[in-house]
């Protein structure tokens, strides 16, 4: 009985995290598509714009200049990532909530960007952080989720 409870608790943590991030990611991208034309910018703060772009590649537009094969390649990588991370979560102990949360964030981000690739053929990016004329790569909430998940895992793995 105790093991079933542990598995249910573990599932609850990661399912809730994934759903929450997916809702944020999908709804934010929907609002960007609806209210900001592609390549238009809306200033939010002095260092933050919403800049609507379509990324046909991966992080930092890697592979975006290819002729379309990257959509299938990156979708396959996303699916494999989701499956591997889900398997890892099922093997973790209930007490390893930081790891469960980190893997859940990565799954959520990979799923959010996979949904874009399947439905649009590209990933919708819009968060533009800048200082004067210097702009960091444009990204989205799914990318933030992946990044935060990786940082958490690095802290866990390198702090012991």
UniProtKB/Swiss-Prot annotation:
One of its GO terms (cellular component) is plasma membrane. Pathway: Protein modification; lipoprotein biosynthesis (signal peptide cleavage). It is a multi-pass membrane protein. Keywords: Aspartyl protease, Cell inner membrane, Cell membrane, Hydrolase, Membrane, Protease, Transmembrane, Transmembrane helix. GO terms for molecular function: aspartic-type endopeptidase activity. Its main location: membrane. Its EC number is 3.4.23.36. It catalyses: Release of signal peptides from bacterial membrane prolipoproteins. Hydrolyzes -Xaa-Yaa-Zaa-|-(S,diacylglyceryl)Cys-, in which Xaa is hydrophobic (preferably Leu), and Yaa (Ala or Ser) and Zaa (Gly or Ala) have small, neutral side chains. GO terms for biological process: proteolysis. InterPro entries: Peptidase_A8 (IPR001872). The active site is at residues 125, 143. It holds the Pfam family Peptidase_A8. The chain crosses the membrane at residues 13-33, 72-92, 104-124, 134-154. It is found in: Cell inner membrane. Belongs to the peptidase A8 family. This protein specifically catalyzes the removal of signal peptides from prolipoproteins. This is Lipoprotein signal peptidase.
């Amino acid at each position: 009985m105790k093991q079933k409870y542990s598995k249910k608790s573990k599932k609850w943590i990661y399912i809730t995290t994934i759903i929450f991030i997916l809702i944020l990611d999908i709804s934010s991208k929907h609002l960007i598509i609806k209210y900001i034309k592609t390549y238009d910018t809306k200033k939010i703060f002095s260092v933050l714009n919403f800049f609507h772009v379509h990324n046909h590649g991966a992080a930092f537009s890697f592979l975006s200049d290819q002729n379309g094969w990257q959509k299938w390649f990156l979708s396959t990588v996303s699916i494999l990532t989701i499956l591997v991370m889900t398997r890892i979560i099922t093997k973790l102990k209930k007490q390893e909530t930081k790891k469960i949360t980190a893997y859940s964030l990565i799954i959520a981000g990979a799923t959010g960007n996979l949904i874009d690739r399947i439905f649009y053929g590209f990933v919708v990016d819009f968060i533009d952080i800048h200082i004067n004329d210097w702009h960091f790569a444009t990204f989205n909430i799914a990318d933030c989720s992946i990044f935060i998940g990786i940082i958490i895992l690095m802290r866990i793995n390198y702090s012991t």
